[in-house]
Amino acid sequence: MKKYLQQLYEGIFTNNPVLVQLIGMCPTLATTTSLNNGIGMGLAATAVLICSNAVISLLRKFIPSKVRIAAYITIIAGFVTAVDLLLQAYLPSLSKSLGLFIPLIVVNCIILARAEAFASKNKVLPSIVDGLAMGLGFTFALCILSSIREILGNGTIAGVSLFGENYEPMIMMILPAGGFLTLGCVIALFQKNLKKGE
């Protein structure tokens, strides 16, 4: 149990896919304009990570090494399709807001990296925990970034107005330049605090 808790801690903090490993930048920058988008993208990726890690771990001895990447992408694509269809059916506004970035989870570096580096070499339960840990780390990073960008760029959080009618939002924060600026500042602060804790 302690091993799994350590895995969770590492996935969220010391080995965070976005804030430490710097992978998955495309959806990170594109979908963090609002907290709802950040949560939606993070949870969708987490579900795909958990399921794909489990299946890849189960099939690791049967997948020939020469076609392993193609096999991983096929497995991941199946779960992404399921998540996309569920979002379209039950959360159509979120699905529309995230647009093309849900199908692009198929080639997300985080998911492919965990399939190759962890799930293909470990048993099912540790692979599921790894998927959960990395997914929560991804969601955590997206929530921080999207909260900052939405508050400064719109004056809202999860669509709820914070400052009233007179607030002049910093429109740049919801544009790509604001995404890069916020990401750089958050990474710097996060890594500085990690080094203090060591």
Describe these PLM feature segments:
Residues 6, 128-198:
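C-terminal transmembrane helix-loop-helix hairpin of multi-pass membrane proteins
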Residues 35-51, 71, 95-106:
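Structural signature of hydrophobic alpha-helical transmembrane segments
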Residues 12-31, 42-43, 182:
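The first (N-terminal) embedded transmembrane alpha-helix
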Residues 7-10, 14, 57-61, 126-134:
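Short amphipathic alpha-helical coupling elements at transmembrane boundaries
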Residues 25-29, 45-50, 77-84, 106-112, ...:
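Hydrophobic core segments of alpha-helical transmembrane domains in multi-pass membrane transport
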Residues 63-76, 97-103, 127-130:
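Cytoplasmic-side transmembrane-helix entry/capping segments in multi-pass membrane proteins
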Residues 82-97:
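Transmembrane alpha-helix boundary signature
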Residues 52-65, 112-122, 189-196:
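C-terminal ends of transmembrane helices
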